[in-house]
């Protein structure tokens, strides 16, 4: 991202369900800013600027959060949506220290058509996100997996995923991110 986005929020005094309902009725979104040092600040933000920012950066980019005139680097940490309307009902911001690594989820994008799919196999995506550890300013937008060389009954494991410099995958077990399985008809034919 070439230019850091910014979002202005205000601190809020009213806490609880009733106060939050009033904010939402006034086209405001209640939220909480969690500082890297453990300080929690209840905030409110206008819905439209928040919606625009979230559609541009989601949860994978640092932006400048302006709280009552003070600018702090932050991530959109958690967003709650209305169950039937396209509205954000609550947002959590996480203040980051730009010099310390953080753990975040990054979406996986699969490109290409595998050898196994060409032969009739089924692509199975096991993980849509990968947990990574990196500095806040080098969080990748997405992790692209080229699957053109994956054959039937083969997988791409997390240890095989090529990540940008300064980004490390977080995992205990070497799990499969994607795999190509034999189709049901092929599997039945082999068993007969």
UniProtKB/Swiss-Prot annotation:
GO terms for biological process: translation. Gene3D superfamilies: Ribosomal protein L25, beta domain, Ribosomal Protein L25, Chain P. The keyword rRNA-binding applies. Keywords: Ribonucleoprotein, Ribosomal protein, RNA-binding, rRNA-binding. GO terms for cellular component: cytosolic large ribosomal subunit. One of its GO terms (molecular function) is 5S rRNA binding. It comes from the Bacteria. This is one of the proteins that binds to the 5S RNA in the ribosome where it forms part of the central protuberance. Part of the 50S ribosomal subunit; part of the 5S rRNA/L5/L18/L25 subcomplex. Contacts the 5S rRNA. Binds to the 5S rRNA independently of L5 and L18. Belongs to the bacterial ribosomal protein bL25 family. CTC subfamily. This is Large ribosomal subunit protein bL25. It comes from Solidesulfovibrio magneticus (strain ATCC 700980 / DSM 13731 / RS-1) (Desulfovibrio magneticus). The lineage of its organism: Bacteria, Pseudomonadati, Thermodesulfobacteriota, Desulfovibrionia, Desulfovibrionales.
